[in-house]
Structures are given as structure tokens and as C-alpha cells.
Amino acid sequence: MTETSYIMAIDQGTTSSRAIIFDKHGKHIGSSQKEFTQYFPKEGWVEHDANEIWNSVQSVIAGAFIESGIKPVQVAGIGITNQRETTIIWDKKTGKPIYHAIVWQSRQSADIANGLKEAGHEELFHKKTGLIVDSYFSATKIRWILDHVEGAQERAERGELLFGTIDTWLLWKLTDGDAHYTDYSNASRTMLYNIHELKWDEEILKILNIPASMLPEVKSNSEVYGVTKGFHFFGSEVPISGMAGDQQAALFGQMAFEPGMIKNTYGTGSFIVMNTGEKPHISKNNMLTTIGYGINGKVYYALEGSIFVAGSSIQWLRDGLKMLERASDSEEVALQSRSQDEVYVVPAFVGLGAPYWDQEARGAMFGLTRGTTKEDIVKATLQGIAYQVRDVVSTMKEDTGIDMSVLKVDGGAANNEYLMQFQADILNIPIQRAGDLETTALGAAFLAGLAVGFWKDLEELKESYEPGKIFQTQMQEERREELYAGWKKAVNATRAFK
């Protein structure tokens, strides 16, 4: 590996695709981003055009090379990280998708999920996959496409169709159809993968009538899956050597390599993931059990709590209530509040995620008086994000018995100093902000680089990690518990109002 070698991370997200080029020290030297179309055919449905996603990825690869000034031949390996659960089915010979990609947020297969519950399959799915039965995951989306595209079931049974999440689709396209693989982390989000036996589950496939021939082979998160075909990568054959779903990539990028290490990504929603080590913890409290990552012949499991609304509640203050000009203004406005924290905002705009999993709940405000100001509402909205994180972290502690010493954070809202300080106060543990908030792409780059010897081992990765600011608890215990008790009352009242 020469001094002039680099690693490229492709970060394929829900609204945009990005490519970032990293050097040996984990610093990005060039990047490019491109948004793509969101399709909403019916209420609750969300779809993407898989070919448009592929075109956007090709565009950002070129853009990253232009910005960095490096040549494709200098790329030692490519890591892919992706929006998870989003489902694509395509023709094996032509490479043409038979339907739009059904996005993780989409509820169009909810009836299939409800049918599985009514048939009494919930416990079986939970034990084998670690997941709750929900249309969030890929399994019901596959079944929906096979049911609604004419002839699809028969074609799948004849071995003519392939399924993949976004990682698999991009790998297949980059290798010109040579590689049909996925990784442990993405497989564990399909609701088809047995996380104990590390294989596609025959009983589940039979229940859903999904032919096994459609499914990609599952590999580790750090190995060479194939090489780019020259015409897709400007004349170079570069190994694709790392893959992970976005939240697991962020866990790896945050260096959460030991059991009990926990990270939270504050994005549109908030995703708290804890490394639980080499044995899965099946949650008794509605946390998702998933695979964190598999490297060097070992698989590390994780617990995940998904919060549906985090950063999007700040966007609501800006766009819906017109209380902010810019989302970043929320910190300054919150600090102007003179309230005693008696206002609570429960941002259940699309229901409540973990640990409640209440799709029917809707947002509410409590404690309003004639004296309540917009500053109070902005502050309470930020606090609502932090309270939800405590709900999840407390539940994880109850599930595992593990005391967390620090919460590692990243994502856009982690820049909000007021939110981070309140988060430390309400959790009573330090908050460590990442020095570089691009931890998702960095995790994919790390996985790719380890596989090709760009980095030697985890110890060398740790040397490149630069933590950002640490926020220490400043609140008294009595005050903390008083505030949190008020939040629990607000959530209970919200759930009662339907």
C-alpha cells in the first residue's frame, strides 16, 4: 500500500447518495452528494427508482474524484454503507428492476405484516430474527412485490429474479452482475435471516413463500466481494471490500468495538445501537436484536432502538410552525427560554418507536399557559428528543444489565450544544461527540480498508480516532428524575389520546 492510496466510501442514504474519499488518517479529502426522487404513490407508501439511485452513485463517484484530484487507480478499496431494509427485485439476465425500490419507511406491506401476526407467527420471527414483525423490514416488501407484479412469483420460482437491499444492488451493478452478495448487518434487517444459525431461515421462507434462489449469499462486513468493472470505475478494477447498513457502519465508525459500547446517531430519526458482544441478547422490552458486524471470523451482535422523530421535529419547528429561520437556530432560541421546563413536547408525528412501538400515537404538547413562548416550545422540542433517547437507553440497560459509561454521538443534531448538554443531564452519563460527524461513511471506509490491508487492525484504527467535545452531567439527581417523571406522564397521556 503506497502513501498515495485512499479508500472510497459510498454512502447511499434515503434522500441522497454520497461518495467520500478518505486518507490513511481517516480524514476526508474529497466528497460529492446528489439527491434523488422520492415517490409517494399512495398515503404511507414511499418508493425509489433503483436505476436513479445507481445513476446518482455513478455521479457522486465522479464528483469525489474531481474534488479530491486523485485518480481511480489510487483507490485501494471501496466500502458501501446504505439505507437498510429498502427492497429491490430485478431480472437476473437484464438487470432491470421489476418494480420500484420499496423504502424502509413505506407501510404498503402493513397488511402482510398484520397477517403474519394474526396467524400467530410473531414469536417465531422474533426468536429467529431478533426483530418484531413489521412492514419496516424487507420480508413483507418482497412478498408485496411478488404478489403485485404480474408473473413475479412464477419467475422467482424459475430462478429468473434476484432480491437485494441497496448494498447488494450497488455491488451487483459495480461488478456488472458478477457478485450477488450481502453482509451480516443488512441480512439481519430483512426479517428472513436466522441470526443464531447465520443463514436464511427455511421455515420463514416457507411461511412467506419466498424462493431461496432469489436471495444473495451472506458474507462478512470486511472482505473482498468483487472488483469494479473498468467501464463503471473509469478504467480501474478496484476491490469492493466493505459493506454495512448505515447504523451498523456508524457503530463501527465510532469505534464501539467492546460490549456495552453504545452510539446514537441524531438524524431525521434517532438510532441508538449497543454492541452486546458475541452472543445475541433477545430483548424482552421491544428493542431490536441485530447483527452489529462480522469481521475476522467473529460476529458481534447489537441491540437497537429506533426513534422515528428526532431532527425532523426541529424541521417541523422551522417549516410547520415557522418558529425558526434555520434549524441550527434552535440552540440559541432554546437558551432564551425562561420556562422552568414545565412544557413537554411529545413528537409522535408518525407514531412512537422503541420501546413503545405505537403506530397510532400522535404528537402532543403539555403544560402550556398564557405565558408560554415560542422559545419554551423550541426548548421543549429539543428536550423531547433527549427524553426519547433516555427511554431507549434505560430499556437497553434493563435488557442487558450493562451500565453504560459514555454515549457516543454523531449526526447533524449532535452539533446542537443545548441538546447535547441536556442529553448528558437527563441520562446522567457523559456524551462524547465524534470529532468527525461523518461516522457512517468512515465506518464503511474502515471495514473496506481492513480487508485490503490499508489499515492493519483495530488498534491502528483507534490511533486515527479523534473524539470531539465531551458533555458532563450538570443536573441534580432529584431534578433529573422529576423532569423525567413528567415526560413519562406526557407520553402516557399522548398514547391514551387516540
Curated annotation (Swiss-Prot):
<dbReference type="GO" id="GO:0006071">
    <property type="term" value="P:glycerol metabolic process"/>
</dbReference>
<dbReference type="Pfam" id="PF00370">
    <property type="entry name" value="FGGY_N"/>
</dbReference>
<comment type="pathway">
    <text>Polyol metabolism; glycerol degradation via glycerol kinase pathway; sn-glycerol 3-phosphate from glycerol: step 1/1.</text>
</comment>
<dbReference type="Pfam" id="PF02782">
    <property type="entry name" value="FGGY_C"/>
</dbReference>
<dbReference type="GO" id="GO:0005829">
    <property type="term" value="C:cytosol"/>
</dbReference>
<dbReference type="GO" id="GO:0004370">
    <property type="term" value="F:glycerol kinase activity"/>
</dbReference>
<feature type="binding site">
    <location>
        <position position="136"/>
    </location>
    <ligand>
        <name>sn-glycerol 3-phosphate</name>
    </ligand>
</feature>
<feature type="binding site">
    <location>
        <position position="412"/>
    </location>
    <ligand>
        <name>ATP</name>
    </ligand>
</feature>
<feature type="binding site">
    <location>
        <position position="18"/>
    </location>
    <ligand>
        <name>ADP</name>
    </ligand>
</feature>
<feature type="binding site">
    <location>
        <position position="16"/>
    </location>
    <ligand>
        <name>ATP</name>
    </ligand>
</feature>
<feature type="binding site">
    <location>
        <position position="14"/>
    </location>
    <ligand>
        <name>ADP</name>
    </ligand>
</feature>
<protein>
    <recommendedName>
        <fullName>Glycerol kinase</fullName>
        <ecNumber>2.7.1.30</ecNumber>
    </recommendedName>
</protein>
<feature type="binding site">
    <location>
        <position position="246"/>
    </location>
    <ligand>
        <name>glycerol</name>
    </ligand>
</feature>
<feature type="binding site">
    <location>
        <position position="136"/>
    </location>
    <ligand>
        <name>glycerol</name>
    </ligand>
</feature>
<keyword id="KW-0547">Nucleotide-binding</keyword>
<feature type="binding site">
    <location>
        <position position="412"/>
    </location>
    <ligand>
        <name>ADP</name>
    </ligand>
</feature>
<dbReference type="InterPro" id="IPR043129">
    <property type="entry name" value="ATPase_NBD"/>
</dbReference>
<feature type="binding site">
    <location>
        <position position="85"/>
    </location>
    <ligand>
        <name>sn-glycerol 3-phosphate</name>
    </ligand>
</feature>
<feature type="binding site">
    <location>
        <position position="247"/>
    </location>
    <ligand>
        <name>glycerol</name>
    </ligand>
</feature>
<feature type="binding site">
    <location>
        <position position="85"/>
    </location>
    <ligand>
        <name>glycerol</name>
    </ligand>
</feature>
<dbReference type="GO" id="GO:0019563">
    <property type="term" value="P:glycerol catabolic process"/>
</dbReference>
<comment type="subunit">
    <text>Homotetramer and homodimer (in equilibrium).</text>
</comment>
<keyword id="KW-0319">Glycerol metabolism</keyword>
<feature type="binding site">
    <location>
        <position position="14"/>
    </location>
    <ligand>
        <name>sn-glycerol 3-phosphate</name>
    </ligand>
</feature>
<comment type="function">
    <text>Key enzyme in the regulation of glycerol uptake and metabolism. Catalyzes the phosphorylation of glycerol to yield sn-glycerol 3-phosphate.</text>
</comment>
<feature type="binding site">
    <location>
        <position position="311"/>
    </location>
    <ligand>
        <name>ATP</name>
    </ligand>
</feature>
<keyword id="KW-0597">Phosphoprotein</keyword>
<dbReference type="InterPro" id="IPR000577">
    <property type="entry name" value="Carb_kinase_FGGY"/>
</dbReference>
<feature type="binding site">
    <location>
        <position position="268"/>
    </location>
    <ligand>
        <name>ADP</name>
    </ligand>
</feature>
<dbReference type="InterPro" id="IPR018483">
    <property type="entry name" value="Carb_kinase_FGGY_CS"/>
</dbReference>
<feature type="binding site">
    <location>
        <position position="15"/>
    </location>
    <ligand>
        <name>ATP</name>
    </ligand>
</feature>
<feature type="binding site">
    <location>
        <position position="315"/>
    </location>
    <ligand>
        <name>ATP</name>
    </ligand>
</feature>
<feature type="binding site">
    <location>
        <position position="416"/>
    </location>
    <ligand>
        <name>ADP</name>
    </ligand>
</feature>
<keyword id="KW-0067">ATP-binding</keyword>
<keyword id="KW-0418">Kinase</keyword>
<feature type="binding site">
    <location>
        <position position="268"/>
    </location>
    <ligand>
        <name>ATP</name>
    </ligand>
</feature>
<comment type="similarity">
    <text>Belongs to the FGGY kinase family.</text>
</comment>
<dbReference type="InterPro" id="IPR005999">
    <property type="entry name" value="Glycerol_kin"/>
</dbReference>
<keyword id="KW-0808">Transferase</keyword>
<feature type="modified residue" description="Phosphohistidine; by HPr">
    <location>
        <position position="232"/>
    </location>
</feature>
<feature type="binding site">
    <location>
        <position position="84"/>
    </location>
    <ligand>
        <name>glycerol</name>
    </ligand>
</feature>
<feature type="binding site">
    <location>
        <position position="311"/>
    </location>
    <ligand>
        <name>ADP</name>
    </ligand>
</feature>
